[in-house]
Structures are given as C-alpha cells and as structure tokens.
A protein has these predicted regions:
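Extreme N-terminal basic, low-complexity initiation segments
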Residues: 1-12, 16-17
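Short hydrophobic alpha-helical segments enriched in small aliphatic residues
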Residues: 17-19, 35, 40
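Short, aromatic-enriched amphipathic alpha-helices that serve as compact interaction elements
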Residues: 54-70
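Terminal "cap-and-tail" regions of soluble proteins that handle hydrophobic small molecules
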Residues: 42-59, 166-248
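Exposed beta-sheet edge and beta->alpha loop/turn motif
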Residues: 128-164, 178-198
Length: 248
C-alpha cells in the first residue's frame, strides 16, 4: 500500500471517530434533556392528579345529590351538604335541613321530582370550588285535572367547600333555561290559565305553573339563561372562588 492510500485510510478513520463522538455526545445530551423533561412531567402529573381527584370527588357529590334525593334516601342525602348548606329552587329557598324535610314530606305525599345530569364544568381554587352541571328537572303533576310531565332544562350552579378530605355543598342555585309541559295521555289537553302562565319567567314558566297549581309558592326572580340575575350569580361565584364571603 502506498503512502497516499495509507494517508487516506487514516483520514477516514479520524473522520469516522469524530462523527461517532459527535453522535454519542448528541445522544447523551438528548438523554439528559429527556430525563429533565420526564422529571418535570412527573411533577406536573402529580399536580394534575390532585386537581383531577378534587374534580372527581366533587362530581361524585353532584351525582349522589340526584341519586339520593330522587330515591328518597334522606340520611345519605344529608351527607352531600355542609351543616350550613342552603338550597334555592322555584318552590323552596332555605337551609339544607329544611329542604330535606320539605322534600321528604312531598315524597311521602306522592310528589315526584326527578333529576337527570349532563356534563360538569368544575373550577377549583384551594378549598373552594364552583361546579356547573347541565341537568333536567322532570316533575309529574296534575295540571288543571290532567296528569302532565313538566321538563325543565338548565344547570346546577354549586358553591363547594372542602373541609378535611370532604367536598360538600354550601349552596345550590339552579339556572333555569327552558321548559315544556306534556300531557301523559296525548289525547288529554289541559286548559291552561293563560294569564297566570304568562306571569312566570320564560325559563321555568310551565314548571312554575304546574307547581303553583299544586299549592307551591313560586320565586319569580330565579336565574335564567341570560339576564341580570344570572350575571349576579356569576359575579358571586367569582367572588367565592377568590376567597370572598358567600353573598347569597
């Protein structure tokens, strides 16, 4: 082999060694960066898991509210509320204890008000949370001599507080978006009192009418899909999350 060929071989060897070293260095750097990123992901995941757990616990309370209220499981229904918890509804405004007593009395008389839940949006800030849950309220009632089903669509707007490991409701305020009334027998048509019907807010007009016809006093300024009442509710919710007092 001539000197030129030997020199070429040495050059190729040096170039190969240099390229290999650069590749190893790059791989090492990539490994370090990956380890750093993985460590950060572990930290972020830990935070995410705690937040997710809070939301799951809150959602469980929301679901238990509907299950236990509708089934008449009053002892367990009490556990979704804090001691000073309160409920607002078309037909009732007051403490959780008074709401449970009124609901139980109605249940025993045959009043049937059922709740179905959709998705929830839950905002958590420390030991406080706000939950908005899509829902329907369904009530079967006699309306002017005709058995009817009234269905109202809206949201539960819940003020939550965590004490220890337990998230419970401080205040539940429904938002009433729209409703309808249907006779159970399609051939039977109730003759509604139109002037009375027109007195109730659009978002819960038929629900209020049916409840009023069955002896309930109806609150006529409840939050609806739009309007000043729901805007005040949103403002109260923001203040609650920021650490302010419950202004309702």
């Amino acid at each position: 082999m001539g000197r030129a060929e030997e020199g070429g071989d040495r050059l190729r060897t040096l170039l190969y060694a240099h390229a290999t070293a650069r590749t190893s260095t790059a791989m090492l750097a990539a490994g370090v960066n990956f380890a750093i990123a993985a460590h950060g992901m572990e930290k972020d995941t830990g935070t995410m898991d705690a937040s997710l757990l809070d939301r799951l616990r809150i959602r469980e309370v929301i679901e238990n509210w509907a299950r236990w209220r509708d089934a008449g499981d009053w002892e367990r229904f009490r556990t979704v509320w804090h001691a000073e918890g309160r409920m607002m509804a078309t037909w009732f405004q007051g403490s959780a204890d008074a709401f449970i007593a009124a609901s139980r009395a109605g249940f025993e008389r045959g009043v049937r008000i059922l709740h179905f839940l959709g998705g929830s949006a839950i905002d958590v800030s420390g030991a406080r949370a706000l939950a908005q849950t899509k829902m329907t309220i369904s009530q079967r009632a006699d309306v002017d001599g005709v058995p009817c089903d009234v269905v109202c669509t809206g949201r539960f707007y819940d003020f939550f507080e965590q004490r220890g490991d337990a998230w419970r409701i401080m205040l539940r305020q429904p938002i009433y978006e729209k409703d309808r009334l249907d006779p159970v027998d399609p051939a039977a048509v109730p003759q509604l009192d139109r002037p009375l019907l027109a007195q109730f807010p659009e978002g819960y007009r038929h629900l209020a009418y049916a409840q009023a016809r069955n002896g309930f006093a109806i609150k006529r300024d409840m939050p609806q899909l739009t309007g000043s009442e729901v805007e005040r509710l949103y403002a109260d919710g923001a203040a609650w999350l920021a650490g302010g007092p419950l202004a309702r």
